[in-house]
Amino acid sequence: MSVEGILLTIGGYLSGSIPTGVILAKLFGTKDIRQEGSGNIGATNVYRVLGKGLGALTLVGDVLKGIIPVMLACTLAGDELWIAVVAFVTFLGHLFPVFLRFRGGKGVATALGIFLVIAPLMVPLAIISFVLVAMKWRYVSLGSLTASALMPIFLCVAGYPIVYVNLSLAMGCLIFYRHRGNIKRLREGSEKEISKA
């Protein structure tokens, strides 16, 4: 256990905990995004409530929360296990942020940032999967769930280290857990479609 690894892990959690959507909504939208729309702090809800601009900024911010600490881990730690630990804790920071009493987002954008660093060649496949499903069935949540489910398969087939495959499995399970309300609405036929956003 290295000092660098411990510091990177703490920094990753704090980075993941930064509530991008909440901050942007309060700065430019004068609203608490947690009290609007679906109540989620992520880019989709910010887009629906406050428009494309703030939605896009929230997406970028949440992706960067995943990129920066994992890139630092790759540079300073180098060890695949430490990189995976930092990545997972960063992801947990978004889901359970200390700054919001551990009530965070669903993790898709931050997961995207993480995999842009550790498996950049697999990200286009995940994005294509997301787009095809989301456009076909008109549900952002279904696209996100599909991409999350397929990422471990992509990594495994491409021969990535097992620690990264396991990381993607763990993150995927948590993404499904955080989308349990969406899954319920999808089954009931009451999930909000893209065209209605």
Residue ranges and their predicted role:
Residues 1-28:
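N-terminal signal-anchor transmembrane alpha helix
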Residues 4, 8-9, 54-60, 65-98, ...:
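Nucleotide and nucleotide-moiety/phosphate-recognizing core
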Residues 12-15, 90-94, 130-134, 155, ...:
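Alpha-helical transmembrane segments of multi-pass membrane proteins
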Residues 21, 70-71, 99, 135, ...:
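Membrane-embedded alpha-helical segments of multi-pass transporters/permeases
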Residues 22-54, 182-197:
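Cytosolic, membrane-interface loops and tails of multi-pass inner-membrane proteins
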Residues 31-40, 100-112, 139-147:
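Short, non-helical or kinked segments that cap or interrupt transmembrane helices
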Residues 47-50, 73-76, 93, 108-137, ...:
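Interfacial segments of multi-pass membrane proteins
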Residues 122-124, 140-147, 160-171:
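Loop-to-transmembrane alpha-helix initiation sites
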